[in-house]
A protein has these predicted regions:
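NAD(P)-dependent aldehyde/semialdehyde dehydrogenase
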Residues: 29, 37-157, 166-216
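Glycine-rich beta-alpha junction loops
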Residues: 11-15, 22, 48-55, 161-162
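Rossmann-like NAD(P) dinucleotide-binding subdomain of oxidoreductase/dehydrogenase enzymes
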Residues: 1-36, 41
């Protein structure tokens, strides 16, 4: 109908950006739990783990150390038989696609989960249910890469030294990210927070200003 406002929100992409990960087992465990609990199904779910490096060797070492954390999260949070089966199905499908050379990258398989280290730097969807892409993305390339997805970005899970956080937060905001949180809190919501960068109800509420007459000024 004329004058009817439409809901304009669509699918969004979220990711984790790690500029430091050695010695951060608690934060990485929280990220692994987020990946398993959300299964990559939410707009705020991490689709790609970006590492602040351009060395694939560092990406390889990260994947080898992170797979056990994913397996531990899988054992903890997939209690139902259906959940275990779904995660295992996606993991085996990913493994078969790699075996048939249909998917690029190096596969790091785990129990009901997997990591795939890719050489490109693009933000894209992961295979879901604990099967996640890992890519190297140094800070100098972060802005142009993310701006290619501007308008589709939502949450960034940021893990970095405290002194680097203000600069990285500003950089992510400039790229178009609308929510920045610790990696394990990417899908946690806060009362009154915005959605995709705005307070949605303001678009569907009409503001009426009313001024009451006062005794000394009736008109």
């Amino acid at each position: 109908p004329p004058g009817c406002k439409l809901m304009e929100w669509g699918h969004r992409l979220s990711f984790a950006y790690l500029s430091r990960w050695e010695g951060e087992e608690d934060a990485l465990s929280a990220l692994a739990e987020h990946l398993i609990q959300t299964g990559g199904l939410l707009c705020s779910s991490c689709q790609v783990i970006f590492l602040d490096t351009d060395a694939l060797g560092e990406g390889d070492a990260f994947c080898r150390s992170f797979v056990p954390l994913l397996e531990r999260a899988t054992d903890r949070f997939r209690a139902a038989l259906g959940e275990k089966g779904e995660g295992s199905l996606y993991a085996w499908e990913t493994r078969l696609e790699h075996a048939a050379d249909r998917l690029p990258g190096t596969l790091f398989p785990g129990r009901g989960c997997s990591l795939t280290l890719r050489e490109d730097r693009e933000l894209e969807l992961s295979p879901l249910h604990g099967n996640v892409l890992v890519k190297c993305l140094p800070q100098k390339a972060l802005l142009p890469v993310l701006r290619r997805q501007k308008g589709r970005l939502q949450t960034a899970g940021l893990l970095c030294p405290a002194q680097d956080r203000p600069a990285l937060t500003q950089l992510l905001a400039r790229a178009g990210v609308t929510r920045i949180a610790p990696p394990g809190s990417m899908s946690r919501t806060l009362s009154g927070e915005g959605h995709d960068g705005e307070f949605p109800l303001r678009r569907y509420v009409r503001t009426v200003d009313i001024q009451e007459p006062s005794p000394d000024r009736p008109i």
